[in-house]
A protein has these predicted regions:
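Specific transmembrane alpha-helical segments of multi-pass solute transporters/efflux pumps
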Residues: 1-5, 33-85, 121
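Glycine-/small-residue-enriched transmembrane alpha-helix faces in small-molecule transporters
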Residues: 1-22, 132-159, 179-184
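Hydrophobic residues within membrane-embedded alpha-helical segments of Major Facilitator Superfamily
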Residues: 7, 27, 56, 60-64, ...
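Membrane-interface helix termini and inter-helical loops of multi-pass transporters
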Residues: 6-17, 44, 73-74, 78, ...
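Specific alpha-helical transmembrane segments that line the substrate/conduction pathway
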Residues: 19-30, 66-108, 146
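Helix-helix packing/entry segments at the starts of transmembrane helices
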Residues: 21-23, 62, 66-67, 80-87, ...
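Hydrophobic transmembrane alpha-helices of multi-pass small-molecule transport proteins
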Residues: 32, 107-126, 181
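Cytoplasmic-side transmembrane-helix entry/capping segments in multi-pass membrane proteins
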Residues: 49-58, 104-117, 164-174
Length: 195
């Protein structure tokens, strides 16, 4: 996650954010495809059954979580991005509770609080002034959406069983992720003005 946020903050100065996400997942798909092509071809009947779920996973995991941090990087800081992204476990617990009736117990709450405190301390390097002086921007909303997207991806990846092996499944998730970004990539290529 940390390297992704650094790329999000620095990379958008050189490459438009949607392009960065689109090409990232396109390259991932092209790298994986030679290793999974035969299996995917043999399991095409499974892909036909599961493509809607795979598209959703690709849209959340590669589209929302791939592009939104890069969009956020245009207007917010790496510190803000890191702090907001750590809210993902909160959303995972809440969504699992409301939609999958998974119980929230004291152990989960304590673990979550300890995790969030630890991440906050690392991100702000123990400097409370840094936390007090945080300023929020539109980029923070992009990061909040990315955190929710990651939560949805994580939950449905866990709950949706697949007949495909994980390597083949991830190949298709990267494909559908790039596909979900394609119309936005085309729009960005047409309308984006480098500043």
């Amino acid at each position: 996650m940390a390297s992704n946020l650094v790329v999000a903050r620095g990379g958008v100065e050189f490459v438009p954010p949607i392009s960065l996400a689109f090409w990232r997942w396109t390259v991932v798909f092209l790298i994986l495809l030679p290793f999974t092509y035969v299996t995917l071809k043999n399991n095409f009947h499974i892909i036909k059954k599961e493509y809607k779920k795979l598209f959703f996973l690709g849209s959340m995991g590669c589209g929302v979580c791939g592009a939104f941090p890069f969009l956020a990087g245009e207007t917010t800081t790496v510190t803000n991005m890191g702090i907001i992204y750590t809210s993902s476990p909160v959303f995972i617990i809440l969504i699992s509770y409301f939609f999958f009736q998974e119980k929230i117990n004291l152990t989960k709450v304590i673990g979550l609080i300890a995790c969030l405190i630890g991440v906050f301390v690392i991100i702000i390097k123990g400097d409370i002034d840094l936390l007090i002086n945080l300023r929020f921007t539109i980029g923070d909303l992009w990061m909040l959406a990315a955190a929710i997207g990651w939560a949805l991806y994580s939950i449905y990846l866990f709950y949706w069983n697949s007949e495909l092996k994980i390597f083949e499944r991830f190949t298709l998730i990267s494909f559908f992720g790039a596909l979900s970004l394609l119309p936005f990539y085309i729009g960005e290529e047409i309308f984006y003005k480098q500043t």
